[in-house]
């Protein structure tokens, strides 16, 4: 995640901009020059036009900061009437989270097939944990497979 608009990666939407930040320190970036650091309670999303009949892969690298950081990645399909369906989830629990910089864990999930009536696909990422916990995400990708 290289380009930011204030604290939020460019092209992404946040539930609260104050819960996001650009991470650039040693051990905080998987590749490139920066990553996004999400505080507990942060919800970040990005919506794309759907390709009906296809599958989508959501992948990302994550590193936890604090005692109980966790993250959930989700692929959501939305149809022309505005109805949403959860197409895939990947949850990284605190006990499974890599918490030792400069190491990152790699996580991915593949969606169900996109139905013909689906018009958009949304990537949704949510950081959870204690008040002082956060998750650093890098190389977030949604690809047609």
Where are these regions (language model features)?
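Extra-cytoplasmic beta-strand recognition segments
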Residues: 1-4, 40-75, 107-112, 140
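Extracellular glycan-recognition surfaces and repeat-rich motifs
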Residues: 2-35
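Extracellular beta-rich ligand/substrate-recognition surface
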Residues: 33-43, 98-101
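A short, structured loop/turn motif at beta-sheet edges
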Residues: 51-53, 79-82, 113-117, 144-145
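Extracellular recognition modules
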Residues: 59, 122-126
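Extracellular ligand-binding interfaces
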Residues: 62-97
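Extracellular carbohydrate recognition and processing domains
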Residues: 84-118
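Extracellular carbohydrate recognition
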Residues: 103, 127-144
């Amino acid at each position: 995640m290289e380009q930011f608009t204030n604290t939020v990666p460019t092209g992404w939407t946040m539930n609260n901009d104050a819960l996001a930040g650009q991470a650039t320190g040693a051990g905080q970036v998987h590749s490139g020059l920066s990553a996004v650091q999400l505080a507990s309670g942060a919800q970040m999303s990005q919506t794309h036009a759907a390709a009906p009949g296809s599958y989508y892969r959501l992948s990302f690298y994550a590193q936890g900061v604090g005692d109980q950081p966790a993250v959930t990645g989700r692929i959501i399909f939305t149809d022309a009437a505005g109805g949403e369906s959860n197409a895939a989830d990947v949850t990284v629990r605190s006990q499974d989270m890599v918490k030792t910089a400069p190491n990152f864990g790699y996580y991915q999930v593949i969606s169900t097939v996109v139905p013909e009536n689906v018009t958009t696909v949304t990537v949704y990422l949510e950081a959870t944990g204690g008040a002082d916990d956060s998750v650093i995400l890098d190389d977030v990708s949604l690809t047609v497979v």
